[in-house]
């Protein structure tokens, strides 16, 4: 507040709200969830825009198409190597920058290679599905993530691990000890 010397101080307030689309990520309890479709994300963003009645409130959000591709590559497998290579061959660079991002070009690459990106981004997954990243040992047990996912569906929280060990497996990784030494 005090560092904004060039701004008028007083009762005028401007609020900026940033809302990101949910992107399911590996190694989390939400890796089994499907992402909303692009159409649903755009509908939700439109609702946010139309709900903003004050000029003092700004709502920012990540583009639905960018979020979709983020989910595709976050939950993808080695088949997506061909997509990335082909996109590079077609001159796609710096796609994290809005002025360089061409969603239709990405969709054309997927189509030309016969790969359905919605299979990776939008599909709800079962607990017994084998993920491309399951062979990686990052300390947290998959069984724990499944239980956390079930807790999320039930709107339940997990106790703080400093108060009660949830036996996630993280503290046992590389010889560590859980708070309650359950490992």
Regions found by a protein language model. Name each.
Residues 30-40, 73-80:
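Short secondary-structure boundary/capping segments
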Residues 26-29, 69-70:
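Switch/connector loops and helix/strand junctions flanking conserved nucleotide-binding motifs
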Residues 45, 49-183:
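Radical SAM enzyme core and accessory elements
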Residues 19-20, 27, 128-133:
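Generic secondary-structure boundary/loop-capping signal
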Residues 1-26, 40-64:
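Conserved C-terminal portion of the radical SAM core fold
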